[in-house]
């Protein structure tokens, strides 16, 4: 993205794109010997269950991006989006940045594992936007759990915010 915040950006992030291969190398391959010794539910309880929530966090962000892309295809975004991705900084991240051809931005914050998406998390998003030198008139807040009541009330009166929970996804 053409954000201007290069001094705060990490050089690059490499990830295995194929979800099956990623799962295999994260959970199965490192414990192959135990795979043959343990019963399936024992293997799952020992090696997969404790880390599954953290592992799925990344994929929740992907689902949120896909949701925004679908809204874009249906013409339901605040403006047409040309590209979508993430910003990874040295001291913080922006989960989703959707950008138009004239470089207007929509940012997204994805909450997978916290009990609720809070105004403090939004404040951290604003700080990361400053580091990335990104301005946005619209903010999409995604939560797998719930939203802080004060934040939900604020979003009802401020049309810059769009709150999306698991039921909408």
Could you tell me what each predicted segment is?
Residues 118-139, 150-154:
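Short, charged, amphipathic alpha-helix that recurs within catalytic cores of restriction-modification
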Residues 26-28, 109, 151-154:
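Short conserved micro-motifs at the rims of enzyme active sites and ligand-binding pockets
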Residues 140-169:
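Domain-level recognition of nuclease-like catalytic cores that cleave nucleotide substrates
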Residues 69-77, 102-105, 131-132:
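Short helix-loop-beta junction
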Residues 111, 131-132, 144:
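Long, low-complexity, charge-rich intrinsically disordered regions
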Residues 1-91:
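Accessory nucleic acid-recognition modules appended to NTPase machines
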Residues 68, 94-118, 125-127, 139:
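Conserved catalytic cores of phosphodiester-cleaving nucleases, focusing on short active-site segments
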Residues 3-5, 113-114, 146-148:
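Conserved nucleotide-binding/hydrolysis micro-motifs of P-loop NTPases
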